Amino acid sequence: RGFAIKACLPYSYGPGMPGPYIAIIYNALCDSAQGVAFSPAIGYNVPCINVQRGIAMSCDLLVGSTGFVGGNLLAKHTFAAACHSSDITAQYGTCPDLCVYAGVPAAMFLANADPEADLAVMRAARENIRQIAPKRLVLISSIAVLADSRGIYEDSPAQDTEALPAYGKNRLQLERWVREDFPDALIVRLPALYGAGLRKNFLFDLHTITPAMLKPEKYSELAAKSPLVKSAYTLADNGFYKLNGTADPAALRAFFAANDFNALAFTDARSRYQFYNLGRLWSDMEAARAADVKLLHLCTPPVSAAEIYTAVTGKADWHNELPKPPFDYDLRSRHAALLGGSDDYLCTKQQELDDITRFMRSWRD
C-alpha cells in the first residue's frame, strides 16, 4: 500500500545557494500523503505538496496572516501555509502554486512621515515575493495608489504621481515591480474596508465613539470635565494623548456619546467612501483569477459618512463639516458583472448600506 516518489527540481534555494530541491512523497498506511521538501542548503523540511490517492493537490501560501486583511482571508479559506513578517524567510524557495501577498503595512501616517523607510519596506516585500518564487501571485494593494479615484477603471490611463503622498506612491512602485517580476500576477486594489478585527476608519469610530488619541489641549479640556477621561489617556511619544486601556470601554463610550466632541469629530459628514466587506475577498479573488484578470478594483458605490450614520443609527442629527475639502472616492471596475455587480460597482448603494448596517449591529467587542 505504500509508495515513494523522488522528484528533483533545479532551483537556487536562497541567494548563492544552488542545489537540488528534493521532494519525497510517501503513503505508508493511509489513503493520503503529506509531501515534505528537504533542501541541503538550508537543512530542514518545509511544506511542499499534498498528495491524495496519488494526485497532486494545489499548495497555497498567505503572507500577512496576522493582519486585518490576512485574518479575514484565513476565515474564508484554509491555506496550506501562512506566515507574517517575522517568519517569512521560512517560506523562501517553497515555490507555492499560489501566494496571496497581504503583508504590506497599512500605516499611512508612518509611511508619509518617513517615505524612505516606507520605500525600503516595499523593496523588502518585492524581495520576499521573489524569494518565495510562487507560480501564481495575488498582490493585495490599495486605492491609495491613485491621486484621484473618481471615474477611474482598471484600464484608465496612468495618472501623474507627483500629487501622490508617499504612502500611495510607494505602493504604486511595488505594483510596478510585481508586474515586472510576475507579469501574470493579479493585483487587487482595495478601498475602505470592514470585517472581523476592524480597528480603524469611520465605521470603527462610529462603533466606539471614543477617540483613540487626543491633542494635548483637547485632553486638558476633557480631563477637567471627567476623571474617567483623565485616567484613560497617557501622553505618547508623538505628543498626543493615547488610550491606555485602563478605563472601562462602556463607560468611556457613554461619556463621549453624550459629549459634543467624540471620534466622529474627525470625519467630515460630506465625505464619500467606498466600503468593501472583506468577507467576500477570497471568492472575488478566485473569480478574478479564473477569468485571468490582471488588475481588479473591488469597488462599491460611494456613500457619504452622513448616509452611513443615518442607516446605522436611524437618526439624521449628525452634521460635521471640516475646513479641508471632504474626501470623495469613486473607483470603478470593468469586472463588476463578473463578481455579481453591475454599472461599474459590486453592488447597489442600498445593498452596501444594508450590509454595513448588518455588520455594525452585529459587532461584538
Task: Give the positions of each predicted feature.
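Short, low-complexity intrinsically disordered segments enriched in A/P/G/S/L with frequent Arg
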Residues: 9, 19, 37-40
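NAD(P)H-binding glycine-rich loop region in Rossmannoid oxidoreductase-like domains
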Residues: 15, 89-135, 139-154
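N-terminal Rossmann NAD(P)H-binding glycine-rich loop of SDR-like oxidoreductase domains
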Residues: 60-77
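A short beta-strand-loop structural module common to alpha/beta enzyme folds
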Residues: 79-92
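Short-chain dehydrogenase/reductase
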Residues: 115, 119, 156, 160-172, ...
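Active-site Tyr-X1-5-Lys
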Residues: 164-186, 191, 227
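NAD(P)-dependent short-chain dehydrogenase/reductase
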Residues: 184-274, 280
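Mid/C-terminal beta-alpha module of Rossmann-like enzyme folds, strongest
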Residues: 268, 276-335, 350-365
